[in-house]
Amino acid sequence: MHQNTSESAMVSVIIPVYNVQMYLAECVDSVINQTYKNLEIILVDDGSTDEGGKICDQYSEIDSRIHVIHKKNGGLSDARNVGLDYAVGEYIFFRRQ
């Protein structure tokens, strides 16, 4: 029987994205560059009207841990809930830019 330890447990990082293209790369890079690597990074594009959605897609092409969900704007809580529905991690972390 295998038990998850704190060093092997999957962590889901949910990042709602709405019109933050200027800060998005810094935010995502800070998560990617963490020493803990057993992560899934869920970028929820909440109907951005800037280039945020495209930036999210570019990140998903270079890192298989990154998943992107594009949705109609519903606000921060809705974006978080959509991310929660997708998340598979034992632990959940919400990150804002």
Where does each model-flagged region fall?
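Catalytic metal- and UDP-sugar-binding loop of GT-A-like glycosyltransferases, i.e.
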Residues: 71-72, 95-97
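Short aromatic/hydrophobic "clamp" motif used to bind/position activated sugar donors
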Residues: 92
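Acidic helix N-cap motif at the loop->helix transition within catalytic regions
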Residues: 25, 39, 50-58
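A conserved acidic beta->alpha catalytic loop
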Residues: 30, 45-54
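Structural signature of beta-strand start/N-cap positions in the alpha/beta core
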Residues: 12, 37-40, 64-67
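Glycine-rich, basic loop-to-helix element that forms the pyrophosphate-binding segment
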Residues: 71-87
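N-proximal low-complexity "stem/linker" segments adjacent to membrane-targeting elements
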Residues: 1-32
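Alpha/beta-hydrolase active-site loop signature
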Residues: 19, 48, 75
